[in-house]
Every structure is written in structure tokens, then in C-alpha cells.
């Protein structure tokens, strides 16, 4: 069946009423549900469009979109709301963070809903997106996204420096040399005005480079008992990452980053490359001053990427579970994922949408979205555990100290391991 026809059929199915009896019952005559997300203005607009389309098809279900701009504020709001027993009916949760709520019984398992759905089937989704959201054998949330870390680059700056577009098989050395070439004092005053690279400094950012070098984040990925950042392979990768700043100076230092974030520099045309997942695309599409595209991560000893996936999760205390499921089901149908994909926000978790023009349209930037699909076979995940966010945050604090020259790599690794250790015993 042609792809376009299949998408149309999926859309028609989304409009039709579901006849099965859902675990949460049937929606009442008029139901009101809340849906909480985070992100910048462009991301908010994407979800506003999704909600608007849903309302047209389900006028009996009123959806209130709650938008929290900052990720840190969003995490705090989630914690407060769930602790108070007043969470939104539906929340977006990253696979690294949902376990903290699942372990407390705060999420409604969605596997039984999916099993009874006539609109969605587990086999329609990428396994790589679904598996991380299985907690103790049960699917807890429905993933919308199968992104990975990539290199966004300013093509105009590449051309001005005489650089070709990054090749699919470029190496760490190629990456570093490119960043060096792009780092420039453009006005001759002795200060760097244009950096070659910008990145968040976190365990999540350095992880794929550790894997590429043959190392790992923890001792046993399925049943971790400690961070394994002190192995030779992991340490070497961390040193390489830290040297991008302390040795090669191709990224802003702490003072420069505080004055203007790397992402802002990229948006303003004064940064050659920026590491991010797909979620930055709606914002980057507002760029009018230069051409840009996306490239895969450079390769180390082996190829490896890191999963960036979030999912629609339902609060266990929701009083409108049937209505909430109806929205989640629509959002992850062919039609719903098509809506979000065209905004640039996601790498769709539905195979049919990921392979469609909604995602791969070469006329919509980035032109090389195929990069994200090509990386799927090499995607890896962090451990799925209740306390991983705490571990990641503490390790990130120490990595920042090393990255900005406030500690050696060995000091940062030792401190990260020691500070994180209590959280391994506290996780289910």
C-alpha cells in the first residue's frame, strides 16, 4: 500500500470512535483533562497544534495545555504535583526520568490500554523507543520520540572556512580539527568571537563518547551498582571531551558561556557546531540569517549514539483515564505523530511516520533528517532506574568542574563516583 494512502487510513481510523472497553472505562459525555509539557515557544506551539486538532475530532473532551518553559522548572513542578496528588492527567516524561514516578506507583500502566487499542499496535513502533519505557515487565508510557544526539552546524560558517559538510563517517580527529578551524578571533582584538563548538556539559552528553571508546557509564548496565567512569576507556573519553575546552579552547569557557549560552550563539550565527537532539529543530527553523543542517556524531573506536526519547504518561490518580487515553492514543496515531513531526519536534516513534515526508521532507530544515534514522541501530540508553536523575545530576556537576578547568579529570571522576554511590543502593 502506498505510504500516503496508509497515512490517510491511519488518520481516518483516528477519527472513528473506539468500540473496545478500555481499562479506564469510557469517556463521560463531557470530559476535561490536562496535559503538561515543557519547552520553548516553538515547542509549545507544536503541542498547541496537536491539542487543537484533537479538539476538532473530540469536541466532548476539553484539553488544557499546561506549558512550563524551563526543563528544571518542569521537573520541580512534576515533583510537587505528584507529591501533592494533583498532577496533570497526562505528562511528558523522558525515559531517564519516568522510573522515579513508576517506582512509586504514580503512573498508570499503559500496556493494557495499548493491548486493547484498535488504533495503535506495539509492532508499529520502533522497539528502541518502546523498550526503555517498560518497567518491571509492563509498558508504562507511550513514546512519541526516537531522537539521538547529533551535530547541528552552520553551513555558511563551514563554507566561509573552506570546510566541506561533515561526512557520515567522520572521526573524533576530524571533529576536533573542524572545531579548531571554526574557532576564530574575527575582529583581531585578541578575543575569540566565534567558537567552533558548543555543548551542554553533562554525563548525558559525554556518554556516547564513552561508549564509542569501548567504555560504559556503570559496571552492569542492567543491574548497576556503581559508576564505571574510572575505567581506562571511560576516562580516556572523558579526558578527550574535557580537552575540547581546557586544552583546545574550541568551546566557550565558563565566563563566556555564562555571558551567552552556546545555543544562543548558534542561533545568532556565531557558533560553528552545536550538540543537541531533535527537540531544538522547531527553534532552529526560526533562523533566517544563515543556512544550517545536521550531521551524525563523529565516530570513535565504534559507532554509538544516545537515546533521547520522551513519552506520554498518564497519572495514576487521574479521574478521567478514558479521556486521557483517547488523547494519548490520538497523539501517537499516524495523524497525531504526523502533526508533531511536521513541526520538527520529534523523530517519530511510529515507523510509518518516521519514513514519511512529514519527517524526511528535504525542503524543511534540517535537510538531512535521515541522519536520525541512520543512527537508530547504534542507539544506546542510560540505566533505567529510580535514582538515575540524581546520579546524572551529581556526575554532571563534577564533569563541569573538569570541563571548565576547576578540577582534573581524575578528581572529577573520583568525586562523581563517591557522590553518586548512595543512590545506587536507594534504587529499586
Regions found by a protein language model. Name each.
Residues 10, 14-106, 115-122, 137, ...:
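Conserved N-terminal structural module of periplasmic/extracytoplasmic solute-binding proteins
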Residues 56-57, 161, 225, 243-252, ...:
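Extracytoplasmic/periplasmic substrate-recognition and gating elements
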Residues 67-77, 96, 170-177, 252-267, ...:
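Short helix-initiation/N-cap motifs at beta->coil->alpha
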Residues 93-150, 209, 293-295, 360-374:
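Hinge/lid segment of periplasmic solute-binding proteins
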Residues 111-125, 168, 187-196, 215-236, ...:
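Short, solvent-exposed loop/beta-turn-alpha elements that line the ligand-binding surface or hinge
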Residues 128, 292, 342-397, 401, ...:
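Long, aromatic- and glycine/proline-rich binding clefts that accommodate carbohydrate-like moieties
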Residues 135-144, 149, 159, 174-226, ...:
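Extracytoplasmic/periplasmic solute-binding protein
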Residues 178-180, 223-255, 297:
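Glycine-centered hinge/linker elements that transmit conformational signals in sensory
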